[in-house]
Amino acid sequence: MKKVSVFGSTGFIGKTTVGILSGNTEDFKVIALVAGSNVSLLAQQAKLLNAEMAVIADDAQYEELKRSLHGSGIRVAAGKEAVLEAAALSVDTAVMAITGIVALSAVMRLIESGVGTIALASKESVVCGGVLLRDAACKSGTRIVPVDSEHNAVFRLLSQGDNPYKITITASGGPFLHWSHDQLKSVTIEDALVHPVWKMGKKISVDSATMMNKALEVLEASYLFELGYRKIDVVIHPESIVHALAFYQDGTSTALMSLPDMSIPILHALYWPHRKEVSVREVDLIAYGKLTFIRPDFERFPALKAAFDILQSSERDVASIVFNAANEVAVESFLNSEITFLEIVNIVLHVMNKVPYGKVSSLADIMEYDLLGRCIAREVISDAS
């Protein structure tokens, strides 16, 4: 029986994970559940899974969580330090589904605690943690198994032991793939939150619409799998059936295909290195009839071009951190109706040109550049308003 903790249990990935764990109680013992502010759902999940500990990151929710779990025997804690305390608990697998760079400190604490496997759904922590995170995981023996569909597919393809010369990850193209530039000028928040294939949270839905999500995934793949600029490619694949492809020197290639269902990579990461047999729908190629692949237009998706530019830059580490930080601020501003949809990526690119670059050698350096990127992004937004 594996000991498991889930960070970000009340988000979409977290809720899907909890559903899998609740249906396989004979295989998992839940040690800790960590959520941001949804205290009622966290309490329900903790009771359902009989977790040993429930942590709410929002200090103000502590008393409510304590009342909700009174008499359950479940330990309760709140605040940022409590999140790190949960990350230090001894588990076999930790699911990291917290969005944004705030996940990075917890990921590093998990690695320091010697966790066997991190099922990682926080691409931002890899983009910002970069080589520092990868080297720490290698030193401690922690295996990072990515949970997002494309990187989980790459992980599986590379696990076959072959040495591909190139990896291609796919992108759905988002909700505005065929919209004109004039139409994009009038995109509403509601428009951006409706994804044609995947069911996701607000931030990642907006990132998918701007193609920033795929841009971050390009950087994530570079760090996770040590892939250089020429070894990563992206194609738009609206059906989201093929998640990644590996190309070999003998002229052959291998693709990993599945229905667009996040429970598949989550299940794989939870049971890794074993494969869990479950009743799932297989891909019916006859029903689909055809699969579509489109080369992305860098003029239409400047965020994606920026990611490949970063891969070629000698300032990759700092640039990745600032790229993510500025985007988090810009997306938040868009969701607060402070900027337009088209301004999101423009602001990010503007911030990239204003940051003084240097070296990253510690977690403190990462947080410093993250803060700098956020401050400049807020200044740019303020000056434009």
Swiss-Prot record:
Pathway-wise, it operates in: Isoprenoid biosynthesis; isopentenyl diphosphate biosynthesis via DXP pathway; isopentenyl diphosphate from 1-deoxy-D-xylulose 5-phosphate: step 1/6
> Per UniProt, where does 1-deoxy-D-xylulose 5-phosphate bind?
K123, S149, E150, S172, H195, S208, N213, K214, E217
Which keywords appear in this protein's UniProt record, sorted alphabetically?
Isoprene biosynthesis, Manganese, Metal-binding, NADP, Oxidoreductase
Q: Which domain of life is it from?
A: Bacteria
Q: Which residues bind NADPH?
A: T10, G11, I13, G36, N38, E124, G201
Recorded GO terms, molecular function? 1-deoxy-D-xylulose-5-phosphate reductoisomerase activity; manganese ion binding; NADPH binding
Q: Which GO terms describe its biological process?
A: isopentenyl diphosphate biosynthetic process, methylerythritol 4-phosphate pathway involved in terpenoid biosynthetic process
Q: Enumerate the residues binding Mn(2+).
A: D148, E150, E217
Q: So what EC number does this one have?
A: 1.1.1.267
Q: Which reaction does it catalyse?
A: 2-C-methyl-D-erythritol 4-phosphate + NADP(+) = 1-deoxy-D-xylulose 5-phosphate + NADPH + H(+)
Give cofactor(s), names only: Mg(2+); Mn(2+)
Show the PANTHER family listed in the entry: 1-DEOXY-D-XYLULOSE 5-PHOSPHATE REDUCTOISOMERASE (PTHR30525), 1-DEOXY-D-XYLULOSE 5-PHOSPHATE REDUCTOISOMERASE, CHLOROPLASTIC (PTHR30525:SF0)
Please describe what this protein does. Catalyzes the NADPH-dependent rearrangement and reduction of 1-deoxy-D-xylulose-5-phosphate (DXP) to 2-C-methyl-D-erythritol 4-phosphate (MEP).
The similarity comment for this entry is:
Belongs to the DXR family.
Fetch the NCBIfam families from UniProt.
Dxr (TIGR00243)
Q: What is this protein called?
A: 1-deoxy-D-xylulose 5-phosphate reductoisomerase
What is the source species? Anaplasma phagocytophilum (strain HZ)
Q: Taxonomic classification, please?
A: Bacteria, Pseudomonadati, Pseudomonadota, Alphaproteobacteria, Rickettsiales
Tell me the name of the encoding gene. Answer: dxr
